[in-house]
Amino acid sequence: MMRAIASLFILLACAAPQAGWGKPKKAKNVILLLADAGGVATVNAASLHGYNAPLKLYVQSWPHIGLSDTTPVGSWVSDSAAGMTAIVTGQKTRNGVVSQGPDAIRGKKDGTPLKTILEYAEEKGLSTGVISDMPITDATPAACYAQVNDRSAWGKIFLQLFTPRFGDGVDILFGPGRKRIWESAAKANLDIDASARARNRPIYASLNEVPPDADRAIAVVDSGFDLNAAAKRALKSLSKNRKGFFLMIESDAHTDNPQAGLDRLVAFDKLIREIATMVNLNETLLLFTADHSFDLRVTGGTPDKPLLSGLAEWRAQNPRPRNVRIPALQVDGSHSAEEVIVAAQGAGAERVRGFMPNTQLFQIMLAAWGWKP
């Protein structure tokens, strides 16, 4: 009898890991989905705005969720530079600094260059992509591929595309901001076109100009950027690499203009739903988060009226308000310090749970591939 009981305990001990403690699936691809300023309240408001009900966004149905602290070094409230640097390098830095350590002094002194998740992917031979509906040298996309002490140095940021530290650099880069980027470079006596020619990397002025079979392409537009088309085009190109890929897609969810910001977040969520059908989730990690939160609050309202009822009248009386006060919503036009949502599905998503520093997202992505820093 004792022998039988001992045997049963051994069997249970062996079976337990298989019952739910198994290792997370290893990822081939990682897609980082970044809603800039898309805090928890903004995600909630987007659902109420888009569907007149809570919990209707696709990302709100994902099985693995957590909350991420976004505080930078030396402050409670983060900007996009410090917030995204923490996510893609695993190290916190100061506001205004892009993928350099906190020893940097903004605009005055370089700090320690930090290795980004994109650079790890490049080093391993994966394909890489960066897409944003904000200027492609703005702090969030820039943190993936550049190291500078001042986020406003757009020309210097862009030229780092042509001098990669690992691999052959970003394969797919799509976004707006062309005029301002070229102006920034000219003020710093930098020649973008000459650098592009020297590296044999043409810079297209629209997505339509990109050759349909291109594995590597840079497209920087002036206006009319289509995030949906850009993301699908990038996935088509990056998926050709049998080793896998890293792709960061950013959408502007700032709600200083509530109508525009919430519309963009609803549209981004729909795009994410489409992306999930285009990839194999058994080998792809989808990771949704924000670089920082924003001071938006749903303070009233009822289901029989649109969330933004009264906004047009408010705008008519306050043409350029920093703050918005309507029956259901209040917005103070600034970043805020509360935690932001982290949601995940696919390979390695099990690592997303509970409260975490934003630096942990870097570790989650790295671990999904089975890599170590």
What is each of the regions a protein language model found here?
Residues 1-5:
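Positively charged n-region of N-terminal signal peptides that target proteins for export
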Residues 7-15:
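Bacterial N-terminal signal peptides
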Residues 113, 117-119, 123-142:
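Glycine-rich phosphate/pyrophosphate-binding loops
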